[in-house]
Swiss-Prot record:
This is C-C chemokine receptor-like 2. Disulfide bonds join 103-181. InterPro entries: CCR1-9-like (IPR050119), Chemokine_rcpt (IPR000355), GPCR_Rhodpsn (IPR000276), GPCR_Rhodpsn_7TM (IPR017452). Signal peptide: none annotated. Keywords: Cell membrane, Disulfide bond, G-protein coupled receptor, Glycoprotein, Membrane, Receptor, Transducer, Transmembrane, Transmembrane helix. It comes from Homo sapiens. Lacks the conserved DRYLAIV motif in the second intracellular loop that is required for signaling of functional chemokine receptors. It is a multi-pass membrane protein. Belongs to the G-protein coupled receptor 1 family. One of its GO terms (molecular function) is C-C chemokine binding. The gene is CCRL2. It comes from the Eukaryota. Glycans are attached at residue 3. Pfam families: 7tm_1.
Length: 344
């Protein structure tokens, strides 16, 4: 039966680097990603998968059962956790066998999870800005939840559409006596292979780095200009901004290395040493970025007082009394941030 391995170094990032090399007279020693992968990737992916799935399932439980989904930010946070779960589900299969359908499924889950996470981070940031700008009166109470649901559906649809190019061009290919899910241009696609590799790289950089960085920077600068921002500090503002900052810090190194690897001829980085270092940088930064799914639940626990309270009660760390679901808890235990700071 045909087997393939989907590993972080097997995606089009490193493949681009290798296939776009110009024919050089000197023989270059290519970076051997398998050496590091054999030692680190299985244990790292297993740890990230277990921790990330448990953390994000706990977030889903608390949001759905206890905090409720009557606030727009909770709807976005729930979808953000689902995005992380989609991404995490691909990790165990980076070193396991499968067939052509499995390749498509893994590619779809991986990129849909990544793109949707980016979009929900942007939606959270914009929502916090609108709350701050309009003091919670931008929408009526009856329109808040429907607006959150509609924008969430649009975010998922956009993420799926953004993933279609990867879904089409990835196929199992024989490499090192086993099949790997890698870039392979389909004959019916227009333009040449180099064009599509450049296109996929730019799409990745714009969606995962440029777009969220622009939105975050622009809105944060606008908020910093007001006196009210310095006078009023709410934990949810800190939480949303921390989520975005961590996401950018985790994925920016990989996107930069990925971009330089793809367009290295344009930056005079085609020599042996530069190519080797770029391959290594892409591989290592990709592994680091993979761990981002475990960070968000930790931010909730440290920066969201309501979430940490529910979390502690779930584990009976502060109280042995049963935690009541939303709508049944007493006023003293269900108090969250003031309405003018948390609702749109």
């Amino acid at each position: 039966m045909a087997n393939y391995t989907l590993a972080p170094e097997d995606e089009y990032d490193v493949l681009i680097e290798g296939e776009l090399e110009s024919d050089e007279a000197e023989q270059c020693d290519k970076y051997d990603a398998q050496a590091l992968s054999a030692q680190l990737v299985p244990s790292l992916c297993s740890a990230v998968f277990v921790i990330g799935v448990l953390d994000n399932l706990l977030v889903v439980l608390i949001l759905v059962k206890y905090k409720g989904l009557k606030r727009v930010e909770n709807i976005y946070l729930l979808n953000l956790a689902v995005s992380n779960l989609c991404f995490l589900l691909t990790l165990p299969f980076w070193a396991h066998a499968g067939g052509d359908p499995m390749c498509k499924i893994l590619i779809g889950l991986y990129f849909v999870g990544l793109y949707s996470e980016t979009f929900f981070n942007c939606l959270l940031t914009v929502q916090r800005y609108l709350v701050f700008l309009h003091k919670g009166n931008f929408f009526s109470a009856r329109r808040r939840v429907p607006c959150g649901i509609i924008t969430s559906v649009l975010a998922w649809v956009t993420a799926i559409l953004a993933t279609l190019p990867e879904f089409v061009v990835y196929k199992p290919q024989m490499e090192d006596q086993k099949y790997k899910c890698a870039f392979s241009r389909t004959p019916f696609l227009p333009a040449d292979e180099t064009f599509w590799k450049h296109f996929l790289t730019l799409k990745m950089n714009i969606s995962v780095l440029v777009l969220p960085l622009f939105i975050f920077t622009f809105l944060y600068v606008q908020m910093r200009k007001t006196l009210r921002f310095r006078e009023q500090r709410y934990s949810l503002f800190k939480l949303v901004f921390a989520i975005m900052v961590v996401f950018l810090l985790m994925w920016a190194p990989y996107n930069i290395a990925f971009f330089l690897s793809t367009f290295k001829e344009h930056f005079s980085l085609s020599d042996c040493k530069s190519s080797y270092n770029l391959d290594k940088s892409v591989h290592i930064t990709k592994l680091i970025a993979t761990t981002h799914c475990c960070i968000n639940p930790l931010l909730y626990a440290f920066l969201d007082g309501t979430f940490s309270k529910y979390l502690c009660r779930c584990f009976h760390l502060r109280s042995n009394t049963p935690l009541q679901p939303r709508g049944q808890s007493a006023q003293g235990t269900s108090r969250e941030e003031p309405d003018h700071s948390t609702e749109v």
